[in-house]
Amino acid sequence: MFLKKLKLTNFKCLSNIELSFEKTKTENRKWTLILGENGTGKSNILKSIALVTSGSNALGELLGNTDSWIKFNEKSCSIQAELETKKGEERNISLQFNRGDNLSKIISNNRESLHLIDDAIENADRNYFVVAYGASRRLSNEVFSNFEKSRNGRSINVRNLFDSASTLNPLTAWIIELDYRSGKEGINLVKEALKDFLPGITFHSIDKEKKQVLFETVDGIIPLDQLSDGYQNMAAWIGDLLFRITETFKDYKKPLEARGLLLIDEVDLHLHPKWQRRLLDFIGTKLLNFQVVATTHSPLTAQQADSGELFALKRSDNNIVELVPFQGSPKSLLVNQLLMTPVFGLETDESYEVQQAKEEYEALKSKGDSLSSSDKEKMKEVKRKLKTKLPKRKAPSSSDKEIALLQKIETKLNIKK
């Protein structure tokens, strides 16, 4: 299944949002990144996708208070989506919630769309496979506590997006279970999945007696639970995701090549900038046939998006949230250039203190001859501050290696001419 189009009407704070996931008329986009200030509804877009693809049983477990999904002062809300099956067939599905409706009324009113999902799931539970993660991605303290509980229920695959208190299946549990079930073949899958998993560490082995997964680091062989918080946060959802894929597609020789939809809120949470720059490539390489819809606040992550993959939620002058596509390719911009595009909305790449000092100076300067003596003293003070605080910009320079590479490319181009 691939998601082709999404339309939201009065869903939470989103009055009227339309988003196409088509790269071309014949090809769907693999990546969609959504930016936006807090409170503009980034997470709500992910939740709407999870709800409309959930099916009857899961919907009842995820929905909670029906009225909470409807925009304030509105009587109803709707989610409309267009999907494409593995066979290339189009499916139009939708959900509508009316204020005051209970769960049975909602299921009755949306019977036709839910029937499409339910039939597909009944045929094979892995049809329309969707996994979702919220911004709070916590590991269980007990290695196998949630591991056994999570074997049933389609809603479990997206629960973390809706419930910040929900915990994930530990990476340790997945690896030990896979080793027990599949032996050497399982360990090879682990090695392949975790290759380039995190910078500076590699999977080493399993300590079966202590029920620990060991990683090789610059500081020696260290168990997963002793790695940094950033590594463990990444391990939390990556481990849970790998578990769900291999459990669902356990009859596949290469389960990581299965098709599916991954929804993840704040995809780069707690990650060092070096790893943020590699994250999209890692996910795309490991999950070749997954479609990914993610939110981010990071310009480093946004910079990895290709043309047509980056969008921003912005509030208009009349406080309506609008979806703004990024014009051009983020990959072609420097990070500071990207920060000052409309999708991020920064006016300068200088510090807030310097920006304030400049504005104060311009305000004083605009007074012209009407400057008071105290204004003149203030102006001198602001000038001194700017002189010491204003960053010095250097002309961009290239290293000897970069110059040599450019010369080599130029030589090859001349030969081709």
Question: What are the roles of these predicted feature ranges?
Answer:
Residues 1-50, 284:
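Pre-Walker A-like glycine/lysine-rich segment at the N-terminus of P-loop NTPase domains
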Residues 95-198, 342-343, 356-362:
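Coupling/switch segment of ABC-type P-loop NTPase heads
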Residues 296-297:
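Conserved H-loop
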